[in-house]
A protein has these predicted regions:
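Short, acidic Gly/Pro/Ser/Thr-rich loop/turn segments
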Residues: 66, 106-108, 223-225
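Conserved AMP-binding loop of ANL adenylate-forming enzymes
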Residues: 84-118, 124-128
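Nucleotide 5′-phosphate-binding alpha/beta core
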Residues: 1-58, 63-97, 104, 148, ...
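Active-site glycine/GP-rich loop and adjacent strand/helix microenvironment
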Residues: 2-14, 121-347
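Glycine-rich, histidine-containing beta strand-loop boundary motifs that form or position
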Residues: 71-72, 102, 153, 181
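Short low-complexity stretches enriched in small and charged residues
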Residues: 51-58, 101-108, 250-259
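Alpha-helix boundary/interfacial micro-motifs
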Residues: 69, 77-81, 108, 199-200, ...
Length: 347
């Protein structure tokens, strides 16, 4: 990430938080903003020429199609402010302790949640761990004994929160069952309504449409590249009686991650290095299938990699961190019906 003017960042976040307190009750999406924009898909986004931004977001989402987007200063401001908004909507006490289970992270302890002190002067501890095995995460949580836990729903479903005596609440994003709906390329799309938790409210910098099949088309006012972008998720728009005028999402279909099964029967989130697939190997789309305890098939749409297959296999093994046999298979296409980028056939 480029060097930031921290004073400017904090001031911008404070101003945005003040704005959001009022705008949630009066905001209306400006669909005129979209009149000259054509719908683009992930391939269109990938081919788009972009100017270097504050930072680069890389993802394959739930489709197995890697993309990257250059992010602006205001993208980052909205990212911080909407995360603080979610804490406030959920009435989390920032003076208590937070555990964060985050992809690619190493075990660390921090004084403070990472919220600027000018906004929240007194904060509890933040404990961070990566996507380790479920048993390791469970043991770590019991040792740290946090009040709040930030964790992906698929991992949360494998954990026993009753063994954490301080536990109050958990939240997550990226999948069905999450309290926040977000993506790397779009940022925070929607947050669970604090009054009606069965629905989510779309953020003020986001405009959501759907095609005839219910596939979400998302635009953001803070990023020049996310304009009428066909995201790939199927959603259902609706209404909420809480009084907020924000767009409302009733349902998000799909986006549930299967767990990778380890040789000892333990499970973990399947990180397989996919953010590097397009830039390093030219892989346009992929799907990983764990056929048994010892075998992972990586199906890819790509030109033949030749000797680079070995490099790809080593990358997958490094990220999955398990003695698995990786087999590369080339395919021409994937059926879109119920596509999942990772499937485990291990019972």
């Amino acid at each position: 990430m480029a060097v930031l003017d921290q004073k400017k960042l904090v001031q911008s976040v404070k101003e945005l938080l003040n704005y959001l307190e009022v705008s949630q009750w009066k905001h209306k999406p400006n669909f005129d903003f979209l009149t000259k924009s054509k719908v683009i898909d992930r391939e269109g986004l990938r081919k788009m020429k972009m100017v270097k931004g504050l930072y680069t977001a890389k993802t394959s989402g739930s489709t197995g199609i890697p993309v990257k987007v250059e992010k602006s200063f205001m993208d980052y401001v909205w990212y911080i402010a909407t995360n603080i908004r979610e804490f406030r909507w959920r009435k989390w006490d920032v003076k208590k302790n937070l555990a964060q289970i985050k992809a690619g992270a190493t075990k660390s302890d921090f004084v403070g949640w990472g919220i600027p002190q000018e906004i929240e002067p007194i904060q509890g501890m933040k404990y961070v761990i990566g996507y380790e095995s479920i048993s390791e995460i469970q043991k770590w949580l019991e040792e740290k004994n946090p009040h709040y836990i930030q964790v992906a729903p698929s991992i949360a479903s494998q954990l026993d929160f009753t063994k954490i005596s301080n536990y109050i609440d958990h939240k997550g994003t990226g999948e069905v069952g999450g309290s926040m709906y977000s993506s790397e390329e779009c940022g925070t799309i929607a947050i669970q309504c604090p009054d009606n938790p069965e629905v989510m409210h779309v953020m003020e910098n986001i405009i959501v449409e759907t095609d005839p099949d219910g596939v979400m088309i998302v635009s953001t006012t803070t990023n020049p590249y996310i304009k009428r972008y066909k995201h790939g998720d199927v959603i259902e728009l609706g209404e909420c009686n809480c009084g907020r005028t924000l767009q409302t999402i009733n349902k998000v279909q799909g986006r549930v991650r299967n767990m990778f099964v380890l040789p000892n029967g333990d499970k973990k989130w399947p990180l397989i290095g996919s953010k590097e697939y397009y830039d390093k190997f030219g892989i346009k789309r992929y799907k990983a299938i764990q056929t048994d305890i010892e075998t992972l098939e990586l199906h890819i749409i790509s030109e033949p990699l030749g000797e680079k297959e070995i490099e790809l296999i080593l990358l997958v093994k490094e990220w999955i961190n398990s003695p698995v046999n990786v087999i590369i298979k080339y395919v021409d296409e994937f059926p879109n019906y119920k596509f999942e980028e990772f499937v485990s056939l291990v019972k």
